Amino acid sequence: MISESLLLVFLIVFISASLLKLLFVRENKPKAHLKNPPSPPAIPIIGHLHLLKPLIHHSFRDLSLRYGPLLSLRIGSVKFIVASTPSLAQEFLKTNELTYSSRKMNMAINMVTYHNATFAFAPYDTYWKFMKKLSTTELLGNKTLGHFLPIRTREVHDIIQFLFHKSKAQESVNLTEALLSLSNNVISQMMLSIKSSGTDSQAEQARTLVREVTQIFGEFNVSDFLGFCKNLDLQGFRKRALDIHKRYDALLEKIISDREELRRKSKVDGCEDGDDEKVKDFLDILLDVAEQKECEVQLTRNHVKSLILDYFTAATDTTAISVEWTIAELFNNPKVLKKAQEEVDRVTGNTQLVCEADIPNLPYIHAIIKETMRLHPPIPMIMRKGIEDCVVNGNMIPKGSIVCVNIWAMGRDPNIWKNPLEFKPERFLEGEGSAIDTKGHHFELLPFGSGRRGCPGMPLAMRELPTIIGALIQCFEWKMLGSQGEILDHGRSLISMDERPGLTAPRANDLIGIPVARLNPTPFRQM
């Protein structure tokens, strides 16, 4: 029989434990009383899937206009939080940066990028930090970019010569494809020392694969959002992703094996240090790091392959897309084009082709690039995955939510920009706008993201964009063709500015036109 004293002790312990549990729960759930962001009515199982159109960032903007700048959506079983103001962007990307420093991987990304070997979609951990440091100091540092200046210069010269020959023949050019070839040639030479020349070349294969990768990464796969469909390949994504992965892996395996054999031969010949003048490409740098046994992170073969894919994907599409949008906007805004040409003519004297050394003297070209990226950011939304519960503007944001900062919508918001749909580069040269840059410090303009996960390729992009755009408008006018092949009346007929879906935000239709030489002969610098 239990004594009264023992029963009393038991009761005291029970009551104390209950009180402690109650206090613990209350202490650890201080956010339970907080409101959730507004949300449209949902349908069981699919959530808000029925409200989305192919251009997701457009759909998110339309819903935000109705329900507010902080919006909660459920796509199947996945919760999305849409943020559409600079202050909210700052909350997620700066104030709570560590909470939102990871990304969600879908099935296609996971399969194509060697599962956990990717850098672009890796969680914010030791591996990611190491790769970010390697990218910013070695792969895309000022010294490395300086070494590759002759490659970038030569590629700009090549496209100008190509367009000049087309101009003499009065032949049309698919500028979309030409710009993709240019950006692919630059990054493939920087990474692998190969250049696209003919349909059977390694760089050409890589370019084809990159376009397939960006397409499948940006497409909607129902299996990523509906749990009961996870193991069902209803849309054939798994089959496509596996095919892309196999072809890419075979291509990279051949390139890496050939390079390793060349490195072994150099060591046997006693040339392992190479010529002091020899510039190492990205692959050599990565293989050097992989061979370091005492390295902070041991790079595997899959790490090397995945990183090359990350950079091919990022550098090929986004640069070409930004130049293409810029040329389209300049055609539709002839006064802006004329002013830009006058600036380039003044700086170069039309005796030499614009080059990277001229960039500091081209403020209007810089303003044009900012204005293009305001209206047409190459990546329309910054997406982050929350690793813990967070409170933003008095709203409870649950752990695991996918936060989408809709930078495309912010660029067109009349509460942020005066006459937002007008293409007016002067807004970045006058008043407060003159202080706005693209480095992620000004949350109304985030074409390269912000903070730790900001795009490491920004220094390369901001060398290429002014030079390519400057050279194109310095050397040519354009007779642009419409959807039916008709020549558009410059100043009256406008190029369509429709978009198509994808990981990036490209134009819906290829940009095709007949180049008309402004300068004859075309000026070239000595290489």
Swiss-Prot record:
Temperature optimum or stability note: Optimum temperature is 25 degrees Celsius.
Gene3D superfamilies: Cytochrome P450
Any one Gene Ontology cellular component term annotated for this protein: membrane
Reactions performed catalytically: a flavanone + reduced [NADPH--hemoprotein reductase] + O2 = a flavone + oxidized [NADPH--hemoprotein reductase] + 2 H2O + H(+)
Keywords assigned by UniProt, alphabetized: Flavonoid biosynthesis, Heme, Iron, Membrane, Metal-binding, Monooxygenase, Oxidoreductase, Transmembrane, Transmembrane helix
InterPro entries noted in UniProt: Cyt_P450, Cyt_P450_CS, Cyt_P450_E_grp-I, Cyt_P450_sf
Residues annotated as transmembrane: 5-25
pH relationship of activity: Optimum pH is 7.9.
Annotated binding of heme, by residue: 455
Record CDD domains: CYP93
Family in the record: Belongs to the cytochrome P450 family.
Protein name per its UniProtKB record: Cytochrome P450 93B16
Originating organism: Glycine max (Soybean)
Lineage: Eukaryota, Viridiplantae, Streptophyta, Embryophyta, Tracheophyta
Gene: CYP93B16
